């Protein structure tokens, strides 16, 4: 790879806004580009983040892309929890796996997925991204709980499990949203 390409790949902001593809509201492929709201979140990210209920601003999409990027380029362990198994499968298939499959072949070849199963990508260099309805055990650098308010209201036992399991897997200095 050329030095100028390596320099670009070292820039997380550039990678996020140039490497990854998503589908737009009409289902058409489009390159992921942060919206002003997503940029504000990205630039102000803290180790513990709360995103108030905001429909159609693309925060879950952005977090999926951030986690995929971290798993690929930082060998980070990442997890995304959805409130139902169907939503977890859909998020994995439509956000994570779609973006991964559309990456340039050179990027995938440099750190191939050794486990590419429904709900999980595990990369040769140690990073991983797990999408399910819960997480327990291990240590995470990134955790995103989608629809946590809904989980708390509809599934209080699952919410307690997330608080005592998944949140505890995210150590100080790592990121939970």
Q: Where are each of the predicted segments found?
A:
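Phosphate/NTP-binding elements of NTP-utilizing enzymes
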Residues: 1-177
């Amino acid at each position: 790879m050329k030095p100028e390409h390596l320099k670009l790949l070292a820039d997380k902001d550039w990678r996020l806004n140039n490497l990854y593809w998503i589908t737009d509201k009409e289902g058409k492929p489009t390159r992921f580009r942060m919206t002003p709201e997503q940029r504000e979140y990205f630039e102000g990210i803290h180790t513990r983040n709360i995103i108030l209920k905001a429909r159609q601003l693309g925060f879950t999409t952005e977090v999926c892309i951030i986690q995929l990027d971290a798993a690929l380029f930082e060998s980070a362990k990442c997890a995304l929890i959805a409130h139902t198994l169907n939503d977890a499968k859909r998020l994995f298939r439509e956000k994570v796996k779609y973006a991964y499959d559309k990456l340039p072949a050179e990027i995938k070849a440099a750190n191939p997925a050794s486990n590419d199963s429904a709900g999980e990508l595990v990369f040769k260099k140690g990073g991983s991204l797990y999408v399910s309805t819960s997480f327990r055990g291990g240590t995470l650098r990134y955790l995103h709980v989608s629809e946590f308010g809904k989980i708390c209201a509809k599934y209080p036992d699952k919410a307690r499990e997330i608080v005592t399991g998944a949140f505890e897997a995210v150590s100080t200095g790592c990121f939970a949203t």
